[in-house]
UniProtKB/Swiss-Prot annotation:
Name of the protein in question: Y-box-binding protein 1
GO CC annotations on file: cytoplasmic stress granule; extracellular exosome; histone pre-mRNA 3'end processing complex; P-body; ribonucleoprotein complex
Positions bearing the Glycyl lysine isopeptide (Lys-Gly) (interchain with G-Cter in SUMO2) cross-link: 26
Biased composition (Basic and acidic residues): 292-305
Quaternary context: Homodimer in the presence of ATP. Component of the coding region determinant (CRD)-mediated complex, composed of DHX9, HNRNPU, IGF2BP1, SYNCRIP and YBX1. Identified in a IGF2BP1-dependent mRNP granule complex containing untranslated mRNAs. Component of the U11/U12 snRNPs that are part of the U12-type spliceosome. Identified in a histone pre-mRNA complex, at least composed of ERI1, LSM11, SLBP, SNRPB, SYNCRIP and YBX1. Interacts with IGF2BP1 and RBBP6. Component of cytoplasmic messenger ribonucleoprotein particles (mRNPs).
Source organism of the structure: Oryctolagus cuniculus (Rabbit)
Region named C5-methylcytosine binding: 65-70
Site description Cleavage, residues in chain: 219-220
Keyword Acetylation among UniProt keywords: yes
UniProt GO molecular function: C5-methylcytidine-containing RNA reader activity; DNA binding; miRNA binding; RNA binding
Gene3D superfamilies (UniProt xref): Nucleic acid-binding proteins
């Protein structure tokens, strides 16, 4: 029995300690000047248990200084004129425009006082009446970071416009005026949001359509090399200006180029049929001139061979004279 009594005595001692601590906290709460704050602090201290003990709640104070970079500072309580340590993690409602949690110097703040390892600390820091804190002027704003959601916004509206347009197409039996308005609104919105995607197809179409037409005109106009000179220049223009579109144009041009080459060959044959006769006559005259010049000093055989055509030429002249 004596051993059981001894074992029961040690657990009886610890409850006395919290009673003393509660007694010590009472003057602190009563000294704060808030009659309702005392019992509120005691009731909140009981559930806190392992957490930090709450000394006072909803205390107003003025920020003495706050370092945004290090993320801590001190608040001077308006009731007891004591300095309370504040960490940036204790700020409950931060300014939504600020990127970091902070408190401005000289700002009036509402907070709860909690016992920390080295003294009183602030917790649940907000503005007076639960309003978000203004924050330090040295803290970075989020204005620069708002541009990204603004850029993402138009595509969402763009999708909504498509949905509205689809719903308008389904309701074709309705009035014609709203359909006309929807049709008028579509191109404007499409042009605003994705201008680059709309410009490229319009820029591509004339490039594919124009060159073959111009090539045909050049073929019909000149039989020389003007058409051939114009084509490689255009290809170089396409290659230099838009290298990605090299594969597209040649596929469309191959059949036309083949047809153009056939036309050129036909034209070349026609020109050859017209041009070679004068060139042959000229060559014959040259050969006739060369042949009589060479044989005189060398052999008489060649002169004999050259004489019969002269005789033959005189014979038709005589025949022409007889006919006259």
């Amino acid at each position: 029995m004596s051993s059981e009594a001894e074992t029961q005595q040690p657990p009886a001692a610890p409850p006395a300690a919290p009673a003393l601590s509660a007694a010590e906290t009472k003057p602190g709460t009563t000294g704060s000047g808030a009659g309702s704050g005392g019992p509120g602090g005691l009731t909140s201290a009981a559930p806190a248990g392992g957490d930090k003990k709450v000394i006072a709640t909803k205390v107003l104070g003025t920020v003495k200084w706050f370092n945004v970079r290090n993320g801590y500072g001190f608040i001077n309580r308006n009731d007891t004129k004591e300095d309370v340590f504040v960490h940036q993690t204790a700020i409950k409602k931060n300014n939504p425009r600020k990127y970091l949690r902070s408190v401005g110097d000289g700002e009036t703040v509402e907070f709860d006082v909690v016992e920390g390892e080295k003294g009183a600390e602030a917790a649940n820091v907000t503005g007076p009446g639960g309003v978000p804190v203004q924050g330090s002027k040295y803290a970075a704003d989020r204005n620069h970071y708002r541009r990204y959601p603004r850029r993402r916004g138009p595509p969402r509206n763009y999708q909504q416009n498509y949905q509205n347009s689809e719903s308008g197409e389904k309701n074709e039996g309705s009035e014609s005026a709203p359909e006309g308005q929807a049709q008028q609104r579509r191109p404007y919105r499409r042009r605003r949001f994705p201008p680059y995607y709309m410009r490229r197809p319009y820029g591509r179409r004339p490039q594919y359509s124009n060159p073959p037409v111009q090539g045909e005109v050049m073929e019909g106009a000149d039989n020389q090399g003007a058409g051939e000179q114009g084509r490689p220049v255009r290809q170089n223009m396409y290659r230099g200006y838009r290298p990605r579109f090299r594969r597209g144009p040649p596929r469309q041009r191959q059949p036309r180029e083949d047809g153009n080459e056939e036309d050129k060959e036909n034209q070349g044959d026609e020109t050859q049929g017209q041009q070679p006769p004068p060139s042959r006559y000229r060559r014959n005259f040259n050969y006739r001139r060369r042949r009589p010049d060479n044989p005189k000093p060398q052999d008489g055989k060649e002169t004999k061979a050259a004489d019969p055509p002269a005789e033959n030429s005189s014979a038709p002249e005589a025949e022409q004279g007889g006919a006259e």
